C-alpha cells in the first residue's frame, strides 16, 4: 500500500479475492461519489474464516444441479486423486512432481505452480493486451520467437517490465500468455473439476412433457459455473477472472481483430480445461463439448464470478448473529432474489446518514421484517412439500435445531402463564400460522368483558374451537352471570310490587 498526497491509499498489487474497502472522507464535496461495495464480502469472509462450512455449502448446492456419484464427488472435494482417461500411473506423476519441484526451487514463473507472485508478473502482459485489442489475429498469429524468449526471461527474473517501450509486438505478448498457461502443472480449471465441467455442458432444457431437449439450459449452466468457480483455489480463480475478462473484451472487438468468442475458445481451451495427460484419442469424444464450454465461459464471463444470491444470503446470516442459520438442505428452498432485495440494508444505511434516531428503529424493523418474510416463505415451502423422505429429513433437522419448540399449543394449568420458548421454528410457526394461533390465544385468555358476562364475550365464542378449554370456562361464567342477572331482575320486580302495594295501603 502506498500513501497518496491526499492521505488516501491505493493498492499497487493484485489483491486475493478482492475484499470490500471502506474509505472515510470528511470532504462534503466527495460524499456524493458512489460507494464501492463488494456484494460477495460475506462469501469471501466465510471462505477464509470457515472453509469447511463454505465448501460443504457450495458442494451441496452444486450437487442439486449436476449428478456427481460418490467417486466423482470425492474427486471434486479433493479426497481422492482424479482418475482421467490416458492416466499413465504413478511413475509419470512422480516425474512430473519432480520437475515441478525443480522449477519451484529456481523461482521460475513459467512452468511453476500458480501463485499470486506469478499472477502479478503475468498481469503485466494482460494489462498490455487490454490496450491492443484491435490487433488483427490477436492470439492466433504467432510472434517473434527471439523477442518472446527475451520477454520470458525478464518475467522469470521477477523484474517490472516496460512492455510498452515498443520493443515487443502485441502478438509476442499474446503468444507468451498462451505459453505461460500451457506450461502450468495442471489446467487453470484443475483436473479435479474436469468431470464437473463435462456434466455442466450436459445441462439441457426440458419440454412441457418433461422430456430432455437438445437446447442448453443457460441459467442452470451459469449457476453451476458460479458455484464451481467458488471451489477453485484463489490463485486459479483470480487468474481465470482476469483471463476471461480479457477474452471477453477481445471478442467485443472482433470486427477489428477477427477473433470471435469461438475462435478464442479454440486457442485457449487446450490450456485452461484440457487435462494435461489426455491423448488425442482420449480427447476426441469430448473435444466439441469442451470447446463449446469455453466459448460459453467467454460470452458469460461477466456473470460467472458472482456468488448466487442464496449463497450471499447464507453467508450474511452466518455473520449477522443469527441464532440458527439456514442449513445446507434449506438452501434449495430459498427463492432466488435480486441483488437489490438482498442489499436493501446497504441503501438504507446510506440514506440514514445524519438522520434522527427514529430512522434507526425503522431500519431495524425493516431488517426484522425482511428476515421474517424469508423464514416464513421457507417454512411454508417445507410445509407444502409432498410427503417424502426429504421432507421428513428437513422436519427432523428443523426440530433438532430447536428442540424446545412445542409442536402444538398445549393446555396451560389455571393460574400459570405459559412461557413461550423464543426459538427459530417457533417464530416461523407463529408467523405462518399467525391468524390461527392468534384466535386460539384469544380463546384461552378470559377478558374482563367475558368475566362481566357482556355480549362481547358471547360473540367471541364463535371464533374459537368447540373443544377449547376456554370455551368451557367462558360458557360456565356466562351461564353464571345470566343466572345472577335473572335473580337481580326477579328481586327488582319483587321490590317494585312490594313498594306499589305499600303505596295502595297507605292511600
Swiss-Prot record:
- Gene Ontology MF, one: GTPase activator activity
**This protein's UniProt keywords:** GTPase activation
What name appears for this protein in its UniProt entry? Answer: Rho GTPase-activating protein 19
Which SMART domains has this protein been placed in? RhoGAP
Q: What are the record's GO terms for cellular component?
A: cytoplasm
Q: Does the keyword Acetylation apply?
A: no
The annotated region (Disordered) lies at 344-371, 400-419, 483-507
Query: Which gene name does the record give?
Result: arhgap19
Q: What GO biological process term is on the record, naming one? A: regulation of small GTPase mediated signal transduction
